[in-house]
Curated annotation (Swiss-Prot):
One of its GO terms (biological process) is carbohydrate metabolic process. Its cofactor is thiamine diphosphate. Its EC number is 4.1.2.-. The keyword Acetylation does not apply. The lineage of its organism: Bacteria, Bacillati, Cyanobacteriota, Cyanophyceae, Synechococcales. This is Probable phosphoketolase. The keyword Lyase applies. It comes from the Bacteria. Coiled coil: none annotated. Keywords: Lyase, Thiamine pyrophosphate. It is an enzyme of class 4 (lyase). Belongs to the XFP family. GO terms for molecular function: aldehyde-lyase activity. NCBIfam families: PRK05261.1-2, PRK05261.1-4.
């Protein structure tokens, strides 16, 4: 239980406390420099020689001393107040600092026994950093206590707030680099304080680290006036506190006092909200920490300023192997931290350092919140079949495919009121998931006006997170998952590209965690629904037509990626149920929100989705015979058009043997040697044959199917139709025609590919061409598709 702050006995450092804190800080700085430079002689027990230096110097020094300065002062508060606190570092290239503190706390040696708190362990600890066969240069999954790698900048603050949601006893201290603060995602994520409820959530303490420089340029926020900077953060809704200077003897006391004040304010805000005394949105505290970049490092090198300059960003001296003067300067730098006072004869931190470290799970490097799979509780999932649509016969009835999903998510929220959230950029209702508002609301701690009561669904305790920033939403959700909870992200398909790179980074995190870090427990999967899809963006036009997000996902590791394109509502329910049960994956579901034909009842949908791919017997007529052609589909709209083409062909050529294959799990198309969901060649051939033409109607860009299936035996006969970047304000059929995924073009393709139809099908082919012309002209004249298109049903 976190104790309440007594400002009178914690705000002031005693001389002994200050000495111990400064010693820890010196030790962390020594370890940070050692990781960048040393491969041997870790405690300088002999003069430094070239053979003690790594052949290739990699890493970043500039942010390390500031990060360790914050770390040790947070540790003091954790010990004194028994705080549940974790640390998120935006400058992930400052990993040497995080690793150093984890080693000093003993956590690193616990999870990596080869890096014990000994001279030999320290030598290994130094050598492995940014070294082949070792560890990376950022706060990777291998880093104890990390939930944020920080390689790609901009996401630290949204991750911090995501971790704090539904974690009422947690404080997340988040260091934002002043370079990172220039990114768009970070700039928006300051507004996360309008979504944090002090009555039920934890707290985030943002610490903007103004060390003044990026790689080779000054930072914007370090070059504006104090008053402008203060006004900026007051405008964001924070109460800023400033810690500024370069003299550790002074700044230790200022930092201790400032942190004590901030924690006191956090606890007061939470107490007022939880007692019902206040329902106003609070002004949360934040800290602006202005210290030199490369603090405590060499002041100058060759007459150039280094400490307090961009020159300290990475490796201040890269030529120590060949420059004896710089080698001596490095040794002097390392000895300036007085390592003989910090480590005992065995190489372990001295007792005075160990005495100020938090204990057990209270160590930031060992806090179970940062290994959220340990805390994860499986969702209590209702039976998705309770929300299934009735399907008396395949292709005879219509339903909005995502509306039943909204009803299912409503029940998920009802059964899991404190560890599941739905995320979306102002599109929950648009994507027809609004049934969730029957049991919850949208989180909103901004001002509310009377008109909001009429359908606004705003509340300070909702389970739906909506802000028009896909970056912020994705950051919230990633951290919510990494700290042991569950979520679901629904967005427009075309604008999922906004978070391309974030999803890419999360995939890397999951892959490394599964492949390299056995002490990280599985976390809930990142589930993304892409709706308002390319084929029904006829009202928004070309800018909203882009199915390429799934192309990005196919580039990521097969260990962590899954893509599903359910053809109807019941398949969507089955897929969603499966994804919400899974761990350590990125599950992408593509499903349109509009009214579509329904094909499978709940049980048939469950069977079909479990297989991921299969022959639709009711749409085929090749039973007991070899097919003349295989018509395949993947995606909802293209499945309808493929079925309509099948029906046309069967009406005009009753003797034509057609096999209809539908794909839900896109990775079933890959060989099983490349993806765990891939089909064996034998199973693939049994579905698609080894020598018959395959007309494949695909939701996305057609070349993606070729990429996945290029090694298959019958690839030469695989002809894929998909979106080809042709679109505008179109009717649904017109858009399909423009991209040749429509029923008429597909039927023509079959006539061209099946040898015995090339001559006898000539008249039908001409009729199909006329249909294309006539339907386009009708769309131009009436603005809609013909009734026989809009009302089409499976005729058999």
């Amino acid at each position: 239980m976190t104790s309440t702050l007594q400002a009178t006995d914690i705000a002031t450092l005693s001389p002994n406390e200050q000495a111990a804190i400064d010693a820890w800080w010196r030790a962390a700085n020594y370890l940070s420099v050692g990781q960048i430079y040393l491969r041997d002689n870790p405690l300088l027990q002999e003069p430094l020689r070239p053979e003690h230096i790594k052949q290739r110097l990699l890493g970043h020094w500039g942010s390390d001393p500031g990060l360790s300065f914050v770390y040790v002062h947070l540790n003091r508060l954790i010990r004194r107040l028994d705080l549940n606190l974790i640390y998120v570092t935006g400058p992930g290239h400052g990993a040497p600092a995080l690793l150093a503190n984890a080693w000093l706390e003993g956590t690193y040696s616990e999870v990596y026994p080869n890096c014990q708190q000994s001279t030999a362990g320290l030598q290994q600890f130094f050598k492995q950093f940014s070294f082949p066969g070792g560890i990376g240069s950022h706060c990777t999954p291998e880093t104890p206590g990390s939930i944020h790698e920080g390689g790609e900048l901009g996401y630290s603050l949204s991750h911090a707030f995501g971790a704090a949601l539904d974690n009422p006893d947690l404080i997340v201290a988040c260091v934002i680099g002043d370079g990172e603060a220039e990114t768009g995602p970070l700039a928006t994520s300051w507004h996360s304080n309008k979504f944090l409820n002090p009555a039920q959530d934890g707290a985030v303490l943002p610490i903007l680290h103004l060390n003044g420089y990026k790689i080779a340029n000054p930072t914007l926020l370090s070059r504006i006036s104090h008053e402008e900077l203060r006004s900026l953060f007051i405008g964001y809704g924070y109460e800023p506190f400033f810690v500024e200077g370069n003299d550790p003897a002074i700044l230790h006391g200022v930092m201790a006092s400032t942190l004590a004040t901030c924690v006191q304010k956090i606890q007061a805000i939470q107490a007022a909200a939880r007692s019902g005394e206040s329902s106003d949105r609070p002004m949360w505290p934040m800290i602006v920490l202005r210290t030199p970049k490369g603090w405590t490092g060499p002041a100058t090198i060759k007459g150039h300023v280094v400490e307090g300059s961009w020159r300290s960003h990475q490796v201040p001296m890269a030529d120590v192997l060949t420059n004896p003067e710089h080698l001596q300067l490095l040794e002097d730098w390392l000895r300036s931290y007085r390592p003989e006072e910090l480590f005992d004869a065995s190489g372990a931190p001295v007792a005075e350092l160990q005495a100020i470290a938090p204990i057990g799970d209270r160590r930031m490097s060992a806090n179970p919140v940062t290994n959220g799979g340990l805390l994860r509780r499986a969702l209590t999932l209702p039976d998705f079949r309770d929300q299934a649509v009735s399907v008396p016969a395949p292709g005879k009835s219509r339903a909005d495919s995502t509306r039943p999903l909204g009803q299912f998510l409503r029940e998920v929220i009802r059964h899991n009121p404190d560890n599941f959230r739905l995320f979306g950029p102002d599109e929950t209702a648009s994507n027809r998931l609004d049934a969730v508002y029957e049991v919850t609301s949208k989180v909103w701690l901004g001002d509310r006006i009377p008109e909001d009561e009429d359908g606004g669904h705003l509340s300070d305790r909702g389970r739906v997170m909506e802000i028009l920033s896909e970056h912020t939403l994705e950051g919230w959700l990633e951290a919510y998952l990494l700290t042991g909870r569950h979520g679901f992200f629904a967005t427009y398909e075309a604008f999922a590209h906004v978070i391309d790179s974030m999803v890419n980074q999360h995939a890397k995190w999951l892959d490394v965690s599964k492949r390299e870090v056995d002490w990280r427990a599985p976390v809930s999967s990142l589930n993304i629904l892409l709706s308002s899809t390319v084929w029904r963006q006829d009202h928004n036009g070309f800018s909203h037509q882009d199915p390429g997000f799934i192309d990005l996902v196919t580039n990521k590791s097969a260990r962590v990626t899954r893509i599903y394109l359910p053809p109807d509502a019941n398949c969507l329910l089955s897929v969603a149920d499966h994804c919400l049960r899974s761990t350590d994956y990125i599950n992408v579901i593509v499903a349109d929100k509009q009214s579509h034909l329904q094909y499978l009842d709940a049980e048939a949908a469950a069977r079909h989705c479990a297989k991921g791919i299969g022959i639709w017997d009711w749409a085929s007529n090749d039973q007991g015979a070899s097919p003349d052609v295989v018509i395949a589909s993947c995606g909802d709209v293209v499945t309808l058009e493929a079925l309509a083409a099948t029906a046309l062909l069967r009406e005009h050529f009753p003797d034509l043997k057609i096999r209809f294959v539908n794909v839900v799990d896109l990775f079933r198309l890959q060989p099983d040697t490349e993806h765990p969901h891939g089909l064996s060649d034998r199973d693939f051939d049994s579905l698609f044959t080894v020598d018959k033409p395959i007309i494949f109607n695909f939701h996305g860009y057609p070349w993606l199917i070729h990429k996945l299936a290029y090694r298959r035996h019958n690839h030469n006969n695989l002809h894929v139709r998909g979106y080809k970047e042709v679109g505008n304000i179109n009717t649904p059929l017109e858009l399909a025609i423009r991209n040749q995924v429509d029923r008429f073009n597909l039927a023509i393709d079959v006539i061209d590919r099946v040898p015995h139809l090339r001559d006898r099908g000539a008249h039908v082919k001409e009729w199909l061409k006329d249909q294309i012309h006539d339907h386009i002209q009708y769309a131009y004249q009436e603005g809609i598709d013909r009734p026989e298109i809009n009302q089409w049903q499976w005729p058999f």
